[in-house]
Amino acid sequence: MKEYFSVKMRASLQGRHVSGAERIVLKEDLPTVISQLSQRPKEYDSLNIKVEKINDLNYIEKSLNVKTINVKDWIEGNKVAVEILQNQGVDKKIAEKYINLIHQGAVNGENMRGAMIVNLSGERVEKDKTRGIRTVNIDFEDRKAITELLKEKGYTERTVDALALATKTLNHPDIVAEYCISDDPSYTTGYVATKTTYYRINPLKQLSNEKGGRIYFVKDTANIEDIYQYLESEAFLIKQLGDLQ
């Protein structure tokens, strides 16, 4: 019987998070993956790798479809993002309010550590507004093949990771859409995910902006405890890649 393990890497520099990654791999692949993840961060003074056996593994048949939208600047990119969110039932003013919050950062000037959860009435409903919520315990069953397919189409390792996270997130019945920008000041591509599609929007934030984060838009009737259990505790592998548009 196959034994799967979760491998999580977190690196920080002077107390600031600089790199993170996660894999779900077979036991025999642990040495290789641990070595790869330890070499991923460029500069750090603290590196932590956590390995845990997975006893209950679930599967998602296919990832979200991928569509790239190139725009002239980040302002236009966010107009496109808001339109996509509106098509999922998110009110325009609510979408704009929380997108602006992501671009400006938390009240203390720092990035939000996890995702915000915002219901369709515009209320933030995550249990801890400082910590937020994280989607973890997700990977592709054949990550190598999926990565090669995406790279052939001009995508990067970032896309592999983000697509896996978004696919798990939007697989929950109460989550209707996601908005995400990186906190890397040099990386301006972001995305909006819906039930069917991962919209990669370039650019979605201003160059040199160090702010970043995620918003999960959920139904007003969403069971928040169930969302936390699903996103943070349940493990999934994705079997196939969706359509590349």
UniProtKB/Swiss-Prot annotation:
Its cofactor is Mg(2+). Keywords: ATP-binding, Biotin biosynthesis, Ligase, Magnesium, Nucleotide-binding. It holds the Pfam family BioW. Pathway: Metabolic intermediate metabolism; pimeloyl-CoA biosynthesis; pimeloyl-CoA from pimelate: step 1/1. It is an enzyme of class 6 (ligase). The keyword Cell cycle does not apply. GO terms for biological process: biotin biosynthetic process. InterPro entries: BioW (IPR005499). Its EC number is 6.2.1.14. GO terms for molecular function: 6-carboxyhexanoate-CoA ligase activity; ATP binding; magnesium ion binding. Catalyzes the transformation of pimelate into pimeloyl-CoA with concomitant hydrolysis of ATP to AMP. Belongs to the BioW family. This is 6-carboxyhexanoate--CoA ligase. It comes from Sulfurihydrogenibium azorense (strain DSM 15241 / OCM 825 / Az-Fu1).
